[in-house]
């Protein structure tokens, strides 16, 4: 069995009490696991299997198919994310982006740190449009999908690639609009399906 630090991505109920869980790990990248009786066993899972939670997970790793999740312990559950809808929406969107755009079983340590940093940043504050665009451009860059940033209005996006800290780069309204047009188009082009969390995020404005 293997113990790793993970970020929980989308989670699906299976049958009456089981769950199929997508996890993003530092060591193994994105994995899919089967958590038997996850909705019934608080001793083994403690109700921690929720999207955007940082978890210490013990599981039996399989090269193909679903790994078996044996035990989950809380690492950082970020309860504040669920107290502000803007933060919750952005964290769910970021997790779904990682789930959709990353290959299974391929370590991406820079992206793991980016996602972890976003979740920590959103603790205690509302997620902003600038936070969203910072995450998106860095995610695309890490995955090798970096778009051309060749106009003055896109300069803040270039600056986002030079710092690892959310909240450092300021956007004017025009710059934020230009960044949104570009990134929305680029991300849609790499996604095989519409993102469910995007509707929730955009409904909040």
Could you tell me what each predicted segment is?
Residues 1-7:
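Single conserved hydrophobic/aromatic residue that forms the stacking wall/gate
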Residues 8-19, 24-205:
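Non-catalytic alpha-helical scaffolds and adjoining flexible linkers that form interface surfaces
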């Amino acid at each position: 069995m293997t113990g790793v630090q993970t970020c929980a991505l989308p989670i699906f109920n299976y049958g009456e009490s089981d769950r199929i869980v997508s996890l993003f790990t530092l060591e193994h990248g994105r994995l899919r696991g089967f958590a038997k009786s996850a909705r019934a066993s608080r001793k083994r899972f403690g109700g921690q299997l929720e999207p955007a939670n940082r978890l210490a997970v013990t599981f039996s790793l399989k090269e193909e198919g679903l790994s078996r999740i044996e035990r989950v312990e809380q690492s950082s559950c970020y309860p504040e994310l669920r107290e502000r809808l803007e933060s919750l929406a952005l964290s769910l969107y970021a997790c779904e982006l990682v789930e959709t755009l990353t290959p299974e079983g391929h370590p991406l340590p820079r992206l793991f740190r980016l996602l972890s940093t976003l979740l920590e940043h959103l603790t205690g504050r509302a997620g902003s449009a600038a936070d969203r665009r910072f995450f998106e451009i860095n995610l695309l860059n890490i995955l090798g999908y970096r778009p051309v940033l060749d106009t003055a209005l896109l300069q803040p996006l270039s600056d986002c690639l030079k710092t690892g800290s959310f909240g450092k780069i300021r956007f004017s309204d025009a710059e934020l609009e230009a960044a949104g047009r570009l990134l929305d188009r680029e991300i849609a082009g790499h996604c095989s399906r519409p993102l469910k969390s995007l509707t929730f995020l955009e409904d909040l404005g």
